[in-house]
């Protein structure tokens, strides 16, 4: 069959499900069976299709239904027998039983109440039963296709005939899905033929003959040879008469084929069931109502055949069973009153949106005429033929073409000539083969080598990939790409104009040559057609209209009627325009080339379009503060939800991979600050000290001499580019964390930095790893560090891109050198040779120094920003966008530095850091950080008090493997701080004394009397051992401390926190101290049984003595009786069982009580 069925469509939608798409709101509730509506053949076919699909996996049930119909037709059973057997056969499918009511005679009806028992209604008298029985036979036989009873035809043959008829009708319905009028006309032909057969029963036949039916169907299916051939199997006699010309009319469009040679036995076989007229039994005369319209019983409350047909169509178009079940689930939500009608339309719009007819029918069922929220999608399906082919399983070429299956019957084409039937060695990649387009496609298709040029394509069809099926999202074109597209469009339009004009000139020149060879009399008689002597009517007309405008029709008419006079004039004008336009093209080429050169590099860079705007917003102070606050809020939310333990972890982490970039960043900032008249000279000196001494100390970098750094910056600015030092060549080892920095006591004093004598450079040594610096900063310092890190990261990107391009250039040069040596010719750049590319003014080795010089020029205003960006694009191509806002970034950093040197809080932050660094509280070795915990806590507390009105940031600089990692953490300073300075000093001193070692008591026994923390026995052992150690020390026999710790495992990992507001200490979970000797666990396992036995014996001895002193014999006996359940008074009957087991080698008695039932009371 042509579809995959929809058996559950009726049950899914028309079942007994309360308020649903059936019943009063969905279907049409019938009356008690006193009125019948006309039933059509498609209703019967739809019902049979439902039965076949529902029992597709159970053919015995379907064949049983066909057998019931056969027996009913032969009057072997009556109408109640049919009802009873059909009800038993479909007892698990109430929708099919209710649907069967449509074919029952008047007065009969099957109802299914809520209790599930069948309620069969029938006429009251037997006479009515007999008449209705005859009616029912006629009624059902009118609707259900069948065959005449032949005893030699088996039941299986009947099933095949039914299947063939249903499959054929469904095939027609699918084929002409886009032309429903053809399908309706076909059904009308069947209705007319059957009705005439009934009306002429018992009288001379005056209706349509089989030959007339076949002729009308052939005219209806013009061009559909496969459908007509299959229809001929149902009317073999009529088809044969038409083919042989003996019928009432001949079909000239249908040619003879293999059906002309019909075997003899096929002529004698019974007529198939599709068009067989209905005949009454010959031996029993009945009261017939055949002259009236057919009637249908009132349809039950579970749905109508129209609804069943709708769901069958939905299942066929959705194809996937899973998708169809999801569609039914949406309707189930509506049945359960969980969604409204409008919401149901929204739910089913993804399923039915591509099928407007089904969607409109669905809305009509709901009573909704119009869907305002989502217009249905246009149906993009192809013709009916393409729906019958599974292109997914067909052979393919690429992603756009599929091969038709070999079983596919080609449509008839009347426009092909003999050349189309030659050897099949060429093919065309075209998907059109119909009558109207064959010849046009034959002319305009492209040929593929390897196949014969004389054959049209009948195999490969175009298989489109819809844009909405693709997940690729194309980016929006930039303005520079649009400019390139406009240039290409203009060039294309001009080329089309020139080529059109040139083609017209060639055509008219050929006409002029032809006229020159004619006699004068022939020239006067010569006329041109609409093509004006060429092969196209359009090209010449366009060229003439372009030149003459409104006068073009007159010129064209003159060329046709008087070509001798008109052709030379028009040809001269065309050639003049050709020269004029060629000269204009040369001028346009220069303009287009300039536009290409300006927009080409810009069009390649998609990120630079929005980078400057977004970067300006991202580098604002508010954006930087919002970034870390959002991370802080996220951590707090995770902690409050219990997803993470409260811990001190950084909110932002940045990596400085190359510390040499710090010098370049400092040089750029100093260069800009030095040339700002708004910054006072004193502030400039302080800024230089921060950049060249304070900041490098945070990053464990070399501290530069101020005077030398400024002179080197000026020399680099004034020196030629070829002598600028590379950052990689200027690298020097950085000092370690313990190297003595220059005297920082007067770093922010009144004396300018240039007056201080230069310090000797420190001795180079290998930088240490796992060292850190701790710095508590306020908002302004946080902004500066973030901007400084952004500047360094962008400088590093530019530097690495320059190194990468240099490496690629050298690799390419080596490859070209090897190739040139093999060919023995000089290698050169083709773009250079063609003068399409100008040599770069900057060598690749100098790209990074040249970039720094351009940034300096941009900062001082000696270079235009547009020129700066274009030069960067030429140097770094699509990676240059990171340097476009370098001037704005340096200006923001200079503005923050001015705040740092002019704000008192910022200066106090630096002074506090320098003081704490001298105390060892601002960094050191990472492994000994626990030693500095108290001092760092004190430093943090002082910093929070200093920045009471601002945010406090904990910034750590960690040096590891040649890199510096900067972490930033926003601290919570909202807890109440004490205002009493005496109490504050006392707390700081207490914390430092508690955690530190220098404040510990010298005597181990001091303070133990108030709250002893040791057991007395351990304390005694310690005193004896301590005295012996002192005696050995006096004799010089004491062991060294490391010998005493041999074989001892220990760890000091306990962590604690102090609440400054409450002076309470809180220990951190999963942190502890431990110490034990190696081998003690093994020895403990060996001696454990002995220790347990000794403890058990001690306990037994103590217990025996206690019993003798405190318990009498009678009391012990009573307790023993009670325990064993032998005491009867006020006790539930029970019995105690004693079991002796051994636990760790010791006998242990276990008691278990078993309760018995209490005897029933009298």
From Swiss-Prot:
- Cross-referenced InterPro entries: HDAC_interact_dom, PAH, PAH_sf, Sin3-like, Sin3_C
Q: How is it modified after translation?
A: Ubiquitinated by RNF220 that leads to proteasomal degradation.
Sites bearing Phosphoserine, chain numbering: 709, 712
The segments labelled Middle-domain in the record are 394-430
Q: Where is the PAH domain?
A: 37-107, 153-238, 292-369
Q: Keyword annotations for this protein?
A: Nucleus, Phosphoprotein, Repeat, Repressor, Transcription, Transcription regulation, Ubl conjugation
Q: Where is this region: Disordered?
A: 1-29, 246-284, 706-765
- Ranges of Pro residues composition bias in the record: 755-765
Q: Where in the cell is it found?
A: Nucleus
Which SMART domains is this protein grouped with? HDAC_interact
Q: What is its main location?
A: nucleus
UniProt region (HDAC-interacting domain), positions on chain: 446-572
Q: Which GO terms describe its molecular function?
A: chromatin binding; transcription corepressor activity
Q: Does the keyword Acetylation apply?
A: no
Q: Where is this region: Interaction with NCOR1?
A: 284-540
Q: Which SUPFAM superfamilies match?
A: PAH2 domain
Q: Name one GO biological process term.
A: negative regulation of cell migration
Composition bias (Basic and acidic residues) maps to 253-265
For this record, the Gene Ontology CC terms, alphabetical, are: autosome; chromatin; cytoplasm; nucleoplasm; nucleus; Sin3-type complex; X chromosome; XY body
Keyword hit for Manganese? no
Q: What segment(s) does the record annotate as region Interaction with CRY1?
A: 1-308
Function, in words: Acts as a transcriptional repressor. Interacts with MXI1 to repress MYC responsive genes and antagonize MYC oncogenic activities. Interacts with MAD-MAX heterodimers by binding to MAD. The heterodimer then represses transcription by tethering SIN3B to DNA. Also forms a complex with FOXK1 which represses transcription. With FOXK1, regulates cell cycle progression probably by repressing cell cycle inhibitor genes expression.
Q: How does it assemble?
A: Component of the SIN3B complex, which includes SIN3B, HDAC2 or HDAC1, PHF12 and MORF4L1. Interacts with FOXK1/MNF, MXI, MAD, NCOR1 and SAP30. Interaction with SUDS3 enhances the interaction with HDAC1 to form a complex. Interacts with CRY1, HCFC1, MAD3, MAD4, MAEL, REST, RNF220 and SETDB1. Interacts with C6orf89. Interacts with MYT1L.
| Protein name (Swiss-Prot/TrEMBL) | Paired amphipathic helix protein Sin3b
Say which species the protein is native to: Homo sapiens
Organism taxonomic ancestry: Eukaryota, Metazoa, Chordata, Craniata, Vertebrata
